[in-house]
């Protein structure tokens, strides 16, 4: 039996549930799938109960780190969603920092019985650092709170916390409901789940497609073809490339070099254009073999710049994950692996942080010995003698 064809007619959006342990993230995920299956039956909308989401996380490898996540899919009248729910707090942290699950937006689940808790704060901070710009709040377990004023207080507290981390705390949507009651079939609470999904549909913008973004192609290999010029090969990260396009070669060297594309090839065949995801060879006019190397990127002119200093949000592998056995201190100098190459850099720890233990996550300042094409949201690994000891994401460019 052939698998059903993936329907591209609806825009696809990636979302997830975030929030403190036991506030109801997985129950809400189950409630969304179940209520949508009841209200908008389709081959995509299949009810998933708590146990099936909780018990069957997939182990994903990303940058040498194992991450457990549960994925469900569902659709509303206007969109198709992939929804990610990570079982443990450490899985969330790793997931967000490694970019394993890129979320276009997220539902922050807060139990009305507790209000914001330490991991609520941490997940909001992580969302800010890794560039999840759109959060919707679901105040869960409202059926267990009799006092209307208490609910108002909790909502105010959540909004203040979001504003503290530069989210539009006063304006973003807050939905009050009960995931468990909705799962049990209480129509009042089912209606609230539908209201939540309408809000997700309207509040989280449709993501820009990778092909619409400016060209970025990390160079993996370089060779010269006698009489034709220099070819750089790699997988197009985003954007498109066509013959006669003007491009820039960015990173590692002090000077950014401009060139013109004279040919695009894939599997030895000429292409009119290469698209995001394609493995291509790009023939470049006016570029000598020694003027381009692995670790640089080919990019749309002006779209990305080389930098040596940035702030990063990093997760340091624990000993059990194959990481370091000992902490590191200020001015630790590992290699930073960006896309296709290692560059040595030094780490400055935040004021008041004396050392970083294996298994910690921390904000660091990095200074690289060579400039690399980076921007907010670029992910990297931290390596020591070829093995991964950490993973991170650029949260702010400094110089």
From Swiss-Prot:
Belongs to the TRAFAC class translation factor GTPase superfamily. Classic translation factor GTPase family. EF-Tu/EF-1A subfamily. Monomer. Mg(2+) binds at residue 26. Coiled coil: none annotated. Keywords: Cytoplasm, Elongation factor, GTP-binding, Hydrolase, Magnesium, Metal-binding, Nucleotide-binding, Protein biosynthesis. Residues 19-26 are annotated as: G1. This is Elongation factor Tu. It comes from Streptococcus pyogenes serotype M12 (strain MGAS2096). CDD domains: EF_Tu, EFTU_II, EFTU_III. GO terms for molecular function: GTP binding; GTPase activity; translation elongation factor activity. Its EC number is 3.6.5.3. SUPFAM superfamilies: EF-Tu/eEF-1alpha/eIF2-gamma C-terminal domain (SSF50465), P-loop containing nucleoside triphosphate hydrolases (SSF52540), Translation proteins (SSF50447). Residues 85-88 are annotated as: G3. Residues 10-208 form the tr-type G domain. GTP binds at residues 19-26, 85-89, 140-143. It is an enzyme of class 3 (hydrolase). It comes from the Bacteria. Residues 64-68 are annotated as: G2. Its main location: cytoplasm. One of its GO terms (cellular component) is cytosol. InterPro entries: EF-Tu_GTP-bd, EF-Tu_GTPase, EFTu-like_2, EFTU_2, P-loop_NTPase, Small_GTP-bd, T_Tr_GTP-bd_dom, Transl_B-barrel_sf. Residues 140-143 are annotated as: G4. The gene is tuf. GTP hydrolase that promotes the GTP-dependent binding of aminoacyl-tRNA to the A-site of ribosomes during protein biosynthesis.
